[in-house]
Amino acid sequence: MAVAVCHFRLGPEVWNTASMEMPKVKQDMPPPGGYGPIDYKRNLPRRGLSGYSMLAIGIGTLVYGHWSIMKWNRERRRLQIEDFEARIALMPLFQAETDRRTLQMLRENLEEEAIIMKDVPDWKVGESVFHTTRWVPPLIGELYGLRTTEETIHANYGFMWYT
């Protein structure tokens, strides 16, 4: 057996108990004079800064960034000039060291050439192959011809950490 559940409750003014008719529903009516105006526009609160203030902040950021870049470029240029001056001052020392190392290697090569070619008649140790009286800087192969392969590779390619 099903039990009916009433989802709404009608008051005694609506329920007519004498005739047991269908209840009459009281209809709500607007108040006298009608309802007031309804505000239907979107009313969102302001969020964040205004456009002008964001534009001002953006321009200020750009100006500050430009100023800091200019300042750093001036400092970098000053440091670069200092490095160039130090390099120019040390260049004669480096050139003298390179010349000393080259002459030492040429002397060692001449000694090795004298040992290797001692049995060859009419061989002049240290004779120039260029037939000139001017100084010609020796080539890498000429300097490192009698050296080990590792020394030649190091002279040609410099320091290689992966070998």
Swiss-Prot record:
<keyword id="KW-0813">Transport</keyword>
<comment type="function">
    <text>Accessory subunit of the mitochondrial membrane respiratory chain NADH dehydrogenase (Complex I), that is believed not to be involved in catalysis. Complex I functions in the transfer of electrons from NADH to the respiratory chain. The immediate electron acceptor for the enzyme is believed to be ubiquinone. Involved in the interferon/all-trans-retinoic acid (IFN/RA) induced cell death. This apoptotic activity is inhibited by interaction with viral IRF1. Prevents the transactivation of STAT3 target genes.</text>
</comment>
<keyword id="KW-0679">Respiratory chain</keyword>
<keyword id="KW-0496">Mitochondrion</keyword>
<keyword id="KW-0999">Mitochondrion inner membrane</keyword>
<comment type="subunit">
    <text>Complex I is composed of 45 different subunits. Interacts with CARD15, but not with CARD4. Interacts with STAT3, but not with STAT1, STAT2 and STAT5A. Interacts with OLFM4.</text>
</comment>
<keyword id="KW-0812">Transmembrane</keyword>
<dbReference type="GO" id="GO:0098803">
    <property type="term" value="C:respiratory chain complex"/>
</dbReference>
<dbReference type="GO" id="GO:0005739">
    <property type="term" value="C:mitochondrion"/>
</dbReference>
<keyword id="KW-1133">Transmembrane helix</keyword>
<dbReference type="GO" id="GO:0005737">
    <property type="term" value="C:cytoplasm"/>
</dbReference>
<dbReference type="GO" id="GO:0005743">
    <property type="term" value="C:mitochondrial inner membrane"/>
</dbReference>
<dbReference type="GO" id="GO:0031966">
    <property type="term" value="C:mitochondrial membrane"/>
</dbReference>
<comment type="similarity">
    <text>Belongs to the complex I NDUFA13 subunit family.</text>
</comment>
<keyword id="KW-0539">Nucleus</keyword>
<keyword id="KW-0472">Membrane</keyword>
<protein>
    <recommendedName>
        <fullName>NADH dehydrogenase [ubiquinone] 1 alpha subcomplex subunit 13</fullName>
    </recommendedName>
</protein>
<dbReference type="InterPro" id="IPR009346">
    <property type="entry name" value="GRIM-19"/>
</dbReference>
<keyword id="KW-0249">Electron transport</keyword>
<dbReference type="Pfam" id="PF06212">
    <property type="entry name" value="GRIM-19"/>
</dbReference>
<feature type="transmembrane region" description="Helical">
    <location>
        <begin position="48"/>
        <end position="70"/>
    </location>
</feature>
<dbReference type="GO" id="GO:0045892">
    <property type="term" value="P:negative regulation of DNA-templated transcription"/>
</dbReference>
<dbReference type="GO" id="GO:0005654">
    <property type="term" value="C:nucleoplasm"/>
</dbReference>
<dbReference type="GO" id="GO:0045271">
    <property type="term" value="C:respiratory chain complex I"/>
</dbReference>
